[in-house]
Amino acid sequence: MKYIGAHVSAAGGVENAPKNAVAIGANAFALFTKNQRQWKAKPLTEESIAAFKENLTEAGIEARHVLPHDSYLINLGHPEAEALEKSRGAFMDELGRCAQLGLPLLNFHPGSHLKKIDPEACLDRIAESINLAHGSVADVITVIENTAGQGTNLGYRFEHLARIIAAVEDKSRVGVCIDTCHAFAAGYDLRTVEACEKSWAEFDRIVGFKYLRGMHLNDAKSEFFSRVDRHQSLGAGNIGWEAFRYIMKDDRFDDIPLILETVDTSLWQEEIKKLQQWSVVEWRELEKTKTS
C-alpha cells in the first residue's frame, strides 16, 4: 500500500500538522517540529506533545508514515569545528523532538564541504556526526536525503549516500529519502519507464532498497543533470508523470512516506488523489495476479 502526503504546515503548534494532512486527503505527511530557519526553539510542551499524538491517532496516520525534516541551517559535514559542533547540537535536539513526539524518522540533508575540505572528508564527517547523534538520542532513525548537488552540497550521487551508510555504526538506524527532483537534477533520468528502471537499478546496486525509508515526490523546473534544485508541480516539469506512475505501480515503494514538496500547495489534494488512483490500480492488478 502507498502512503502519500505532503510537507504540511505546523503553524500554531506541531499538533496542527495531522489535521492539515487530513484536510488534503493524505495518509502520510512531513513537517518541521520547529522553525527551520532558526537555530534554537522553545521546548515542546507536554500539552503540545499529547495533542499531536491524539490528533495523529484521530487522523488514522501511523507514526512511521510521518517524515519530519530538520532545520536547513544544519551542516553535519561542516569543515569548521565550532560550526560543526553547533550543527551537531541542533541535530541532536531535532532527534530529541522526534522522540518526544513518538516519531521514528528524521529526514535531513547530509551537508556541504564549502570548498574547505575534500568531499570524502566531508562525507566521513557526516557519518561521524550521525554516530554521535545516535549515541545521544535513542531509537530515532536518521534518514539521509539525496541532493541536487547545488553549490557544495554533497549527497547528489548514490555513492555519497552509500559511503555515509558504510561508516554509520548502527545500520538499523540509518536510511535514505530519495527526492525525485534532486535525483533528476543530479543526473538520474526518470522520464520514461526504461529510464526509471535503469536509475532505480543503480540505486539498488549502490545503496539498496532496504535503506529506502521515504521519498519526496517532486517534478523539476530544473533541467536534467543541471545540479540545480528547483521543484515543480507533478506533471508540469521536466520529469513528467511517467516517473510518478512508475513509483505508484512498484511495490518496492510500499509502506514508506511518499511526500509532496511541489510548488503549488493548492494542487496537493488533486496530486495526492491522482497518485492514490494509480496505487489502487496497481493493488488491484496485484490481487488479480494472486488469484489467477
UniProtKB/Swiss-Prot annotation:
One GO MF term: DNA binding
CDD domains to which the protein is assigned, alphabetical: AP2Ec
Protein name: Probable endonuclease 4
Chain residues that bind Zn(2+) 2: E145, D179, H216, E261
Catalysis: reaction(s): Endonucleolytic cleavage to 5'-phosphooligonucleotide end-products
One GO-annotated biological process of the protein: base-excision repair
Keyword field contains Nuclease: yes
SUPFAM superfamilies given in the database record: Xylose isomerase-like
Coiled coil segments of this chain: none
InterPro entries per the UniProt record, alphabetical: AP_endonuc_2, AP_endonuc_F2_Zn_BS, Xyl_isomerase-like_sf, Xyl_isomerase-like_TIM-brl
Family from the record: Belongs to the AP endonuclease 2 family.
Cofactor entry: Zn(2+)
Keywords, in A-Z order: DNA damage, DNA repair, Endonuclease, Hydrolase, Metal-binding, Nuclease, Zinc
Binding site for Zn(2+) 1: H69, H109, E145
